Amino acid sequence: MSTKGKHPRADQGTDPFEEKLQRLKEAFNTGKTKTAKFRAEQLQSLGRFLQDNSKQLHDALDGDLGKSGFESDMSEIILCENEVDLALKNLQTWMKDEPVSTNLLTKLSTAFIRKEPFGLVLIIAPWNYPVNLMIIPLVGAIAAGNCVVLKPSEISKNTEKVLAELLPQYLDQSCFAVMLGGPEETGQLLEHKFDYIFFTGSPRVGKIVMTAAAKHLTPITLELGGKNPCYVDDNCDPQTVANRVAWFRYFNAGQTCVAPDYILCSQEMQEQLVPALQNAITRFYGDNPQTSPNLGRIINQKHFKRLQGLLGCGRVAIGGQSDEGERYIAPTVLVDVQETEPVMQEEIFGPILPLVTVRSLDEAIEFMNQREKPLALYAYSNNAEVIKQVLARTSSGGFCGNDGFMYMTLSSLPFGGVGSSGMGRYHGKFSFDTFSNQRACLLSCPGMEKLNGLRYPPYSPRRQQLLRWAIGSESCTLL
């Protein structure tokens, strides 16, 4: 693995990546990564990396995002360890050929799906969950038998340093590499032909990555974002809703792609929800949230300035304070927000929660459906029928009724977007499937040629009728 913490630059040569990428491709062509033994060894080493370097990872996440140990464990380290354990436990089963049914014409043949690796995979991770969103895709890529290039975000520089310097010590350096750099280097890296690209980030950059992939017809997964709606029905307990919404809105200082971006509720519910949210924020972070060890910080000055600008939208009902020196934005609730204001036109990605009033469930659903399909959608109600209505009449990458992003802790559920919020799914076996080519295989008998006479010329109406029956579903039913 490379590159020992150095950022390759274009002026150091015509192409700083070409030689290393060629070596990785050659390593894949040896078949080294395809064996179950190799895959298991690499997964075990990845697990050791997480265990051995827990303190370094926690310190890096704290340095980058002011992330508490609790949040780092819950949203980064533990989930990665769970994915490694799950892959190791199920690797042999996932790798097995999958038998499929045949028709009468192929009854003496063997049909199956073989899961084979794509080859050289590029994983580009963002800064907001820099361990989780790098390691979990890596688990799937290793389990599927690929060679991998990892591109961590240069914005979360402390975590980038840990990944670049320590992870190479645990994985086979002939098959895996960490490559560093900013937008210029990433753009140059994307000029190369990969066999699969996995990108997590903004829709704007996702379009750039997809355009680069299209030049080589490279398959791609895009894990993007968007404005995730949260509908709160009148028939619910405001304090329960406030507790759950405040926790996952302000988790990681709101820098979470599946966090609720705005609440839709009636005017009556808003009047109850605002004091309930204030109560939850005070209980979670104290009278002065700036001094709380449980509230993170904005990643950098650029994002801080952007969020500070959004505080001028609508009317501040809770919070609104900021400190540029600490990159601190207080947990904030906005009311009287207009649809045309910037806070409702872009993904917030910070600890700001606008409340938008609607007159009915139908109006709320219409509001959601007039916008791009989100990565996540939430609904709160004591009436199960209301939850069912929201689920049935909307579309999103993920949905949760009466809770936040707890579904993200389940490897049994696929994670991903739809439309502008992304394409493709991963987590658990879905990660293995994403990084595997589902190869359709049919092994026929080399003899018994007379049985094939039906399909050879000269054709006749009788043969056509028999062929239709032999290929059709009725023949399988009769047998």
UniProtKB/Swiss-Prot annotation:
Residues 477-479 form a propeptide. The active site is at residues 223, 257. Keywords: Cell membrane, Lipoprotein, Membrane, NAD, Oxidoreductase, Prenylation. A lipid is attached at residue 476 (S-geranylgeranyl cysteine). It is an enzyme of class 1 (oxidoreductase). Belongs to the aldehyde dehydrogenase family. Oxidizes medium and long chain aldehydes into non-toxic fatty acids. This is Aldehyde dehydrogenase family 3 member B3. It comes from Mus musculus (Mouse). The gene is Aldh3b3.
